[in-house]
Amino acid sequence: MMTCVALAQENHSYRFSLEDCLHFAVANSYERKSMELTGKSLETTYEQSKQQRLPNLSASVGQNFSNNENGWSTSGSVGVGSSVTIYQGGNINNTIEQNRLNLERNEVQLERYDNQLATQILQSFLTVLGNQELLNYQLEVLNTSREQLKQGQSRHKVGAILESDLLLLEAQYYSDSNNVVDTRINIENNLLDLKVLLSMNPTDDLEIISPDTDNLDGLKESLPTEEEAISLAMEYMPDLRMSDYDIRLAEKSVDMARGNYFPSVSANANLGMGVLAFDGDGNSNWYGKPTESVGVSMSIPIYSRGQTKANVKKSRIALEQAQLDYEQSVLSVRQTVVQAYRDVVSAFNAYKVSQVKENAYSKSFNAYNIQYQYGTITTVELLQQQNNYLNVLNSYIQNKYSLVMKRKILDIYMGKEISL
């Protein structure tokens, strides 16, 4: 009989700032945990490789049974042996160093993953913020549209406006209502995307804490010069440090390949002796004397059918490739940072322009709304101004959060802590 048990996962509620999101993601990311396990494995390999400098030690025990014309007899032996590699072309030290570099490279790779994850979370978080701010404006516009429709219905009853004007007001109200619904759906989808990045249960409740974004002039004031930004990024960017580790690992591979040209020297020591034996008549005696041996052996490579030479050549080619990759990484980092820096400058200018336009169109829309109440402008003129205001508002919110995102991405490149 099979019993099926349904495990209901408990839902949680979270109220997170951007910093909270970053900390939660680092603690719960399955991919990051997998990379940490890889690091533990590399650390184990490194620690074990250091033990290769030490001699090994083994023991042996043997017991024999034989049957002859006198009956059964037994005999046995015990022994202890040890060996140690004295010299192997430097490959023991090279292997240790190679394993250490692999371990450190994995730590830098983990930093790069954290940066990539932080960038994705930042983008998703700001998308939620932008849509939430847009929703607040849309709700204000919807309330205005509702009042306009009520006034229009009253004025239509007394013949102050045409039916076509009333229909335009109704259409605008339902259009604004639909915008609110669409934005709310977008926010829910944005939050779901953010939960995925946080490795959070999709059914958990997540509320984000909105920072103060009314004045973003400080983002420009704290901006370093372009050369300073490049210099900071060149020191911090994990991509460059990983490329540097790749060069050092390739150099060790060359050393290890060249080590096969040299002889290897090892030493060994053994101690053995016989044990008590019984013959078929029940007599016992010790037999044999303890045997001791100490030896040193040397293996000298003479001819390997060109294998060692080929391995050295291929390792040097790999080193040259690693050096080329590093130079390419340097160029890519410089290009990326320069582009990111100029994107920030451009985004700030776009934000300031859209900020001025939003303020102007907001006041203009309010003025048009008052004029419409007194009947000095037509319905078409009012709705045209309202739609112009909505377009400018959308552009303002997009430029606002685009500036924040681009500025914070530049901070990530420069190795600065991310906060809003």
What are the roles of these predicted feature ranges?
Residues 35, 57-61, 99, 243, ...:
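Membrane-embedded beta-strand positions of outer-membrane beta-barrel proteins
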Residues 22, 34-49, 113, 117-137, ...:
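Amphipathic alpha-helical coiled-coil segments
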Residues 7-58, 202, 208-248, 418:
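Bacterial Sec-pathway N-terminal export signals of envelope proteins
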Residues 9-14, 60-88, 95-97, 211-222, ...:
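Small/polar, glycine/serine/threonine/aspartate-rich low-complexity segments that form flexible
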Residues 8-11, 19, 202, 395-420:
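Acidic, low-complexity, intrinsically disordered peripheral segments
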Residues 116-232, 343, 347, 389:
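Periplasmic alpha-helical coiled-coil/stalk elements that build and connect Gram-negative outer-membrane
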